[in-house]
């Protein structure tokens, strides 16, 4: 019996050693893989959970709430800062706006807006309400705002510059054509160079003092045969008798002047003198005098009559009825579509030039006013941890699922390394 027992013991001891050897080699990699998988899975869950802080005996348990719920506001600020500093920078928004706001797209947008407005106001009731609103606005503008603006303009130095520009651009480019010269010469002949006006002007001119002066000048300056006439006969007597003739016999004098004007061809001479006449043909001093008189006259007229005229105009016109008639014609006219195309085309060019010059300053003002950073912070802070977890898992589902398996592989490798250390580097027994 002792022999049998002795023979069995070595066999049992060898089997036990074999089992220990298998566990010695197999267990560390399995345990390492299990630890890696479990720890990574737990770490991922602890990013979001628990959603709220937990307490034990009145004390907050560490690592509660999870990483994202605890630092949600800090996370929101970082995301908002990255969005405004890296993604939606002023230069990037400027490039996006330039790419989107092309002249063609601006024209299409304006055309769509105009057509939409035209369709909206095809309803008579809406059109009537708009007409009343426009009428009230126009009446207020012409009755109150425009008179004040005209009065302020007439008192400022800007009005002088405006009137000077008007004179340079309008009056400076005027030129009297032949037909205009003919009509102007006829008007001057009928209203200025009339026989009666010439007779009265000559009577007023030939005063006794004027006749004496002319007689004296003729005696002193005449030469040759004219000296003999001036000093022997003299011109004082003939001028005095001619004046008496004009005073005493006005009808005969007027007939005489009529024949004189006809024989002198005054109309033809005036037409020739006025044809082609323009401000540019005048001397610089004359042009400056005309400009000064033009500016002074318009400024005085604007100051004296402008506010009152605008106010009377605003009170005398039924602006609501006028606006209703205009809107009815615009909406019902077949030419409106053509006008819309031209308006959209012209407005798009104007808007494109404005945006080319002012887009960058507008973007710099627009971004702070938009408050993107604060809006992102508010949205993220108002998002519940459950929704945030679901959103991140939806975006990185495969990556989050792969992390525990990566941890398992790393744990398995660490277990193999432990086996290597125990069996080779630091053997046991």
UniProtKB/Swiss-Prot annotation:
Organism: Gloeobacter violaceus (strain ATCC 29082 / PCC 7421)
Topology versus the membrane: Multi-pass membrane protein
Name by which UniProt lists this protein: UPF0754 membrane protein glr0504
TM helices/strands, residue ranges: 18-38, 406-426
Subcellular location: Cell inner membrane
A Pfam match: DUF445
Coiled-coil regions listed in the entry: none
Family membership: Belongs to the UPF0754 family.
Keywords: Cell inner membrane, Cell membrane, Membrane, Transmembrane, Transmembrane helix
Gene Ontology CC entries for this record: plasma membrane
């Amino acid at each position: 019996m002792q022999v049998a027992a002795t023979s069995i013991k070595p066999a049992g001891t060898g089997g036990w050693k074999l089992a220990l050897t298998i566990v010695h080699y197999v267990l560390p990699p399995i345990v390492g893989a299990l630890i890696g998988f479990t720890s990574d899975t737990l770490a991922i869950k602890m990013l979001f959970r628990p959603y709220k802080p937990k307490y034990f005996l009145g004390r907050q348990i560490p690592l509660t709430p999870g990483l994202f719920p605890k630092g949600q506001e800090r996370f929101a600020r970082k995301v908002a800062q990255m969005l405004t500093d890296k993604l939606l920078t002023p230069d990037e928004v400027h490039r996006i706006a330039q790419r989107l706001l092309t002249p063609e797209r601006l024209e299409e947008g304006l055309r769509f807006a105009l057509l939409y407005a035209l369709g909206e106001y095809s309803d008579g009731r809406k059109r009537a309400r708009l007409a009343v609103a426009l009428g009230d606005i126009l009446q207020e503008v012409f009755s109150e705002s425009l008179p004040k603006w005209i009065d302020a303009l007439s008192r400022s130095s800007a009005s002088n510059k405006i009137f000077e520009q008007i004179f340079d651009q309008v009056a400076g480019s005027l030129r009297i054509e032949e037909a205009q010269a003919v009509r102007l010469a006829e008007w001057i002949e009928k209203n200025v160079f009339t026989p009666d006006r010439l007779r009265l002007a000559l009577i007023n001119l030939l005063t006794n003092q004027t006749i004496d002066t002319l007689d004296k000048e003729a005696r002193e300056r005449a030469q040759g045969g004219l000296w003999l006439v001036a000093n022997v006969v003299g011109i004082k007597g003939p001028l005095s008798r001619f004046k008496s003739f004009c005073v005493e016999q006005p009808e005969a004098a007027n007939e005489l002047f009529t024949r004189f004007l006809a024989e002198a061809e005054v109309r033809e001479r005036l037409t020739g003198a006025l044809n082609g006449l323009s401000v540019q043909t005048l001397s610089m001093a004359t042009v400056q005098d005309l400009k000064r008189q033009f500016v002074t006259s318009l400024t005085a007229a604007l100051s004296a009559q402008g506010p009152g005229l605008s106010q009377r105009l605003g009170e005398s016109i039924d602006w609501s009825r006028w606006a209703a008639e205009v809107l009815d014609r615009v909406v019902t006219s077949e030419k409106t579509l053509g006008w819309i195309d031209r308006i959209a085309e012209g407005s798009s060019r104007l808007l494109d030039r404005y945006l080319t010059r002012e887009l960058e300053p507008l973007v710099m003002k627009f971004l702070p006013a938009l408050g993107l950073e604060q809006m992102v912070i508010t949205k993220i802070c108002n998002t519940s941890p459950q929704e945030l977890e679901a959103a991140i898992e939806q975006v990185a589902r495969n990556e989050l699922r792969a992390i525990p398996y990566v941890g398992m592989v790393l744990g398995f490798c660490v277990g193999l390394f432990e086996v290597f250390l125990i069996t080779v580097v630091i053997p046991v027994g």
